[in-house]
Amino acid sequence: YCAFFKNVLRYRKERGVKMSTQKKDQYRETVPHKSHFVPVSVHTTKIEIPTETDGVAALPEKNFPALYLHWHPELEFFYVEEGEVEFFIENHAFLLKEGDGIFVPPKLMHWARTKGTVLFHAAVADPLWLISPHNSECFQKYMYPVCSGSWKYAVTFTSEKNWHKEILTQLKFIFSMDEEKIAAKELLIQGTFLMIWQKLYDHHLKSFYPDAKKRSHPKVAAGSL
């Protein structure tokens, strides 16, 4: 517990000056994000904070670590099923309540804390698996900017907007998959991620992409495919 917040304080202090690549590498997550051969992992975590109603002495109200400070080259979707957390991406804080989610772009430092019991899920995927760089036009348009490691691409999801709700529904489907199911249904999982990505692009990412408005999409004549 103490070591966790010491790392956070050290990180915040180091953010005052430009962090060297060597220092940032200290926080790189070493856990491989794979389900057999598929570069996707799904995680479910429940953190229980005792209260007086549990028949034990309540812990003093303060922040407890929910997600340790780290970063990874993969993109991540995080969802709170029960409770609430304060989620940090770099130096930016987001309050996630029950039923909320957040998109974490690749290469960004992130962590979370909570004041009470919380149940959350995370889906981590290799962006190069979602859209291959060999498909250069598609990759440059939809994925490459996000891989630059900028916090501005982060976005929270709530039940207040329809496109948010659609993404949350698709994320819940992904969270229902264990390692065996992911390996057996790779195309279905990839397709679900891509549907999420299309909505994310249309409603959020597109506004940050400098050449998105310049692109034109010629119509394909029926029967020409």
For each predicted feature, which ranges?
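A hydrophobic/aromatic-rich effector-binding and dimerization subdomain
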Residues: 20-52, 109-175, 206
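Tight coil/turn sites that cap or link beta-strands
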Residues: 64, 98-99, 107, 126-128
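Short, Lys/Arg-enriched, Trp-marked, Pro/Gly-tolerant hinge/linker segments that flank
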Residues: 153-164, 178-225
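Generic protein-terminus/edge-of-domain signal
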Residues: 1-97, 101, 140-141, 151
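Short beta->alpha connector loops
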Residues: 85, 107-109
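Short histidine-centered beta-strand/loop micro-motifs
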Residues: 58-59, 65-72, 113-115, 133-135, ...
